[in-house]
Amino acid sequence: MKMYNIPTPTMAQVIMVDDPITTTEFVISALRDFFDKSLEEAKALTSSIHRDGEGVCGVYPYDIARHRAAWVRDKAKALEFPLKLLVEEIK
């Protein structure tokens, strides 16, 4: 059997930044729908983001992190929320 050298994907974290306009309900919903958080995890992370100014939603292969962040940005924009998400490569 031939062995292939498959490179390890570059990993990235999605960071959600707190703002005074985006609702708590939207943040909890986004964390549950796009980042697969349980209700309890989403509530705890939402509180942490509000308290600390930002929080890590998850760590994924870079392309998946970019897509998840884009989906949430699009949903927020459609609802006229200024939610900011960052995708930071993990080295």
UniProtKB/Swiss-Prot annotation:
Transmembrane segments: none annotated. Pfam families: ClpS (PF02617). InterPro entries: ClpS, ClpS_core, Ribosomal_bL12_C/ClpS-like. SUPFAM superfamilies: ClpS-like (SSF54736). Belongs to the ClpS family. Binds to the N-terminal domain of the chaperone ClpA. This is ATP-dependent Clp protease adapter protein ClpS. The lineage of its organism: Bacteria, Pseudomonadati, Campylobacterota, Epsilonproteobacteria, Campylobacterales.
